[in-house]
Amino acid sequence: MIRYLETEEKGRCLDLWREAFPEDSTEFCDYYFKEKMKDNKVLVREENGEIVSMLHRNPYRIYMRGSEAVCDYIVGVSTLVAGRHKGYMRSLMLAMLRDMQEERMP
């Protein structure tokens, strides 16, 4: 199942983040999950209730030719080691691009 996590669920992806990004310190993870995740949209793929793949859409304000727009950049792109090479991330990327197009995001 592919879906966006609700605000109160975002902490569920911390274990996957730590597996995928072992170089990130505990302090950084604490900061990121407390402060940066507030505005993120976290798109996940779940199998049997477990998050197996995720990506984070971070909103970013851009200025171009005198205009301002909000554009998401993608971070936290990861899949459990056991779930790799199964097309999980491909399905998330396609869903995200479709959503961003529907939102008319630049």
Positions of the model-derived regions?
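Short coil/turn motifs at secondary-structure junctions
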Residues: 60-62, 82
